[in-house]
Amino acid sequence: MAGNSQRRGAIRKSGTKKGTSVGSGGQRRRGLEGRGPTPSAHMRPNHPAAKRAKAQQRRPARGRTDETETVLGRNPVLECLRAGVPSTALYVALGVEADERLTESVSRAADSGIPILEVPRTDLDRMTANHLHQGIALQVPPYNYAHPDDLLAAALDTPPALLVALDNISDPRNLGAIVRSVAAFGGHGVLIPQRRSASVTAVAWRTSAGAAARMPVARATNLTRALKDWADRGVRVVGLDAGGDTAIDDLDGSDPIVVVVGSEGKGLSRLVRQTCDEVVSVPMAGPTESLNASVAAGVVLAEIARQRRT
C-alpha cells in the first residue's frame, strides 16, 4: 500500500542513496541549543569588524582631552581650589610636612565635598610618574576651554584688551609659562589652535603656578580665521617673531592688542604671519639668536604693561 514503509522483509539502510552523507542525528543542533542566534560581525571579538570598532572607540575625539588631569604642587593645587575648579579627588602623601598652603588645600577640599585620600608617598610618586608633587595632587576633569568670541567679548569689556595667541607652540611648559605672564601683566586670556598645539594639561597647570585657574584659555578650530575675526572687531594683531620688522621699542601698546607668539624653532606660520598688522622682535645685544617663546612673550607683555602704566 502506498505510504507503507513497513513492507514485509524490507530492510532500512543507513543511507538513502549511494554517496549521500549521513546526518548528525541532531547532535550538532542540540549542541547549539541555548546559545541564541549567531552574533553580528562587530560583536565577535576576533572578527576584523569588531577589532576596527574597538580601535575607533579607543581613538580620542579630535581636539578634545577626555582624560582626567592631575594638578601637582602646593601652589597650583591651592590656586585651583581657591578658584573653585571642579575636582574629583585630593591626594595627600602620608606623613608629609604640612604648611599653610597644604592645610588650606585640605580645608577647602573638605568644605567643597572633594574626597581627600591619604596615600603612601610611593603611591603618589607612581601616580604622578615621579613628577614633582610636593606631597599633594589634585585630580580635575578635562579643562573647560572658552570660546574665542566669549574671550574677546570679556577682554573688550575691560579695555584696553590684551590677549595672547599661540602659533606652533607644542610644549605645555611654554603654554603654562605664557599663561602665567599674561596674568602677571594684566592680560585677559590666551588663544590656542585646536590642533597641533599644547593643551592645558597638568604640566601646563604646574608651570603656570596656578594662573591657569583664573586666566581663561580659548581654543579655535582655525587660528587664522579667529585672528581675522578679532581684527574685524578692532583688535590689532601683532606677531612676535625673531625675524620681525619692528623692534618692541617702537610698538604702540595703547590699542586693543593680541600678541601672536610663534615657536622658537618654526616661528610664525605663513598664513598667521600674513594676518598680522605688524611683526615685532626683541632686540638682543649678545650672540643668542632667539629667545624661548615664553620668555619673549613675557618681554613684550612687560613692555605693553609699562606703556599702559604711563
Swiss-Prot record:
The answer to whether the entry has keyword Metal-binding is: no
Where does the chain bind S-adenosyl-L-methionine? G262, V282, L291
**Annotated region described as Disordered, given as residue ranges:** 1-70
Q: Where are the transmembrane segments?
A: none
Could you tell me where the Basic residues compositional bias lies? 49-62
Molecular-function GO term, any one: RNA methyltransferase activity
Per its UniProt record, what SUPFAM superfamilies does this chain match?
alpha/beta knot (SSF75217), L30e-like (SSF55315)
Q: Does the keyword Ribonucleoprotein apply?
A: no
Give GO cellular component annotations, separated by semicolons. Answer: cytosol
Kind of enzyme, top EC level?
A: transferase
Give one GO biological process term: RNA processing
Which protein family is named in the record? Answer: Belongs to the class IV-like SAM-binding methyltransferase superfamily. RNA methyltransferase TrmH family.
Q: What is this protein called?
A: Uncharacterized tRNA/rRNA methyltransferase MUL_4155
Q: What is the lineage of its organism?
A: Bacteria, Bacillati, Actinomycetota, Actinomycetes, Mycobacteriales
